[in-house]
């Protein structure tokens, strides 16, 4: 198992991801954004959080044009698994690999806290180790996490079982129907605003993210 963790200018969660996979005993490698190909034998691509290119224009809008993203798009179209966390989710949306858009938080503030989440679907490789309706406690940290999609797109998400996680209780950013994470129709590309890599050890206050990464890595 080889995992490619992408790194853009402004990415700041890449070493958290490497540490998380090390805890699971899985090999992972950083891949610089200027690379034109993914490493041979890549089984999973992770686009971690941060502020790629300073979030100028829109979060993820510039990173989408980095050379490595063409390789990621090809990889995803061939059925490869891709996980985008926070800024990674934004990059996946900007790249057209996931539907919808991520807008400024409704309260116009950066939000950083532990957040309760509900598992909506486990019929996918990302959440297969969780039970439907299970409550998770995973940190969020973002200013542009307000997920939006039009009425037709929302209906398609529901019909295709693409809504995987929702915020439980308080909606921290105004996301439509409290959506926290969605996947593509093929269930091979998943984007979420919460940070599972920050919920890997008891010392961090939660281990609820561990099963997500373990399910992908093992």
UniProtKB/Swiss-Prot annotation:
GO cellular component: cytoplasm
Pfam families: GATase_5 (PF13507)
InterPro entries cross-referenced by the UniProt entry: Class_I_gatase-like (IPR029062), PRibForGlyAmidine_synth_PurQ (IPR010075)
Pathway this chain belongs to: Purine metabolism; IMP biosynthesis via de novo pathway; 5-amino-1-(5-phospho-D-ribosyl)imidazole from N(2)-formyl-N(1)-(5-phospho-D-ribosyl)glycinamide: step 1/2
GO molecular function: ATP binding; glutaminase activity; phosphoribosylformylglycinamidine synthase activity
Active site: 86 (nucleophile), 195, 197
Reactions mediated catalytically: N(2)-formyl-N(1)-(5-phospho-beta-D-ribosyl)glycinamide + L-glutamine + ATP + H2O = 2-formamido-N(1)-(5-O-phospho-beta-D-ribosyl)acetamidine + L-glutamate + ADP + phosphate + H(+); L-glutamine + H2O = L-glutamate + NH4(+)
Keywords: ATP-binding, Cytoplasm, Glutamine amidotransferase, Hydrolase, Ligase, Nucleotide-binding, Purine biosynthesis
Subcellular location: Cytoplasm
Translocase as UniProt keyword: no
Domain Glutamine amidotransferase type-1: start-end pairs: 2-218
The enzyme's E.C. designation: 6.3.5.3, 3.5.1.2
Reported function: Part of the phosphoribosylformylglycinamidine synthase complex involved in the purines biosynthetic pathway. Catalyzes the ATP-dependent conversion of formylglycinamide ribonucleotide (FGAR) and glutamine to yield formylglycinamidine ribonucleotide (FGAM) and glutamate. The FGAM synthase complex is composed of three subunits. PurQ produces an ammonia molecule by converting glutamine to glutamate. PurL transfers the ammonia molecule to FGAR to form FGAM in an ATP-dependent manner.
Entries under HAMAP family matching the protein: PurQ (MF_00421)
UniProt subunit comment: Part of the FGAM synthase complex composed of 1 PurL, 1 PurQ and 2 PurS subunits.
Protein name in the entry: Phosphoribosylformylglycinamidine synthase subunit PurQ
């Amino acid at each position: 198992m080889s995992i490619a963790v992408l790194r853009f200018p402004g990415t700041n969660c890449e070493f958290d991801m490497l540490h998380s996979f090390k805890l699971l005993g899985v090999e992972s490698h950083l891949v610089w954004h200027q690379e034109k190909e993914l490493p041979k034998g890549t089984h999973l691509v992770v686009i971690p959080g941060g502020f790629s290119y300073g979030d100028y224009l829109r979060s993820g809008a510039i990173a989408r044009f980095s050379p490595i993203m063409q390789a990621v798009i090809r990889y995803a179209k061939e059925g490869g698994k891709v996980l985008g966390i926070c800024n990674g989710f934004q990059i996946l949306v900007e790249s057209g690999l996931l539907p919808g858009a991520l807008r400024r938080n409704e309260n116009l503030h950066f939000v950083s806290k532990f957040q309760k989440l509900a598992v909506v679907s486990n019929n996918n490789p990302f959440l297969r180790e969780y039970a439907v309706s299970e409550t998770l406690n995973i940190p969020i940290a973002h200013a542009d996490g307000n997920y939006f999609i039009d009425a037709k797109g929302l209906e398609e998400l529901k019909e295709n079982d693409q809504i995987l996680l929702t915020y439980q209780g308080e909606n921290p950013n105004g996301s439509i129907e409290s959506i926290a994470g969605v996947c593509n129709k093929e269930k091979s590309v998943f984007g979420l605003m919460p940070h599972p890599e920050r919920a890997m050890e008891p010392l961090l206050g939660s281990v609820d993210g561990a099963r997500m990464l373990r399910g992908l890595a093992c």
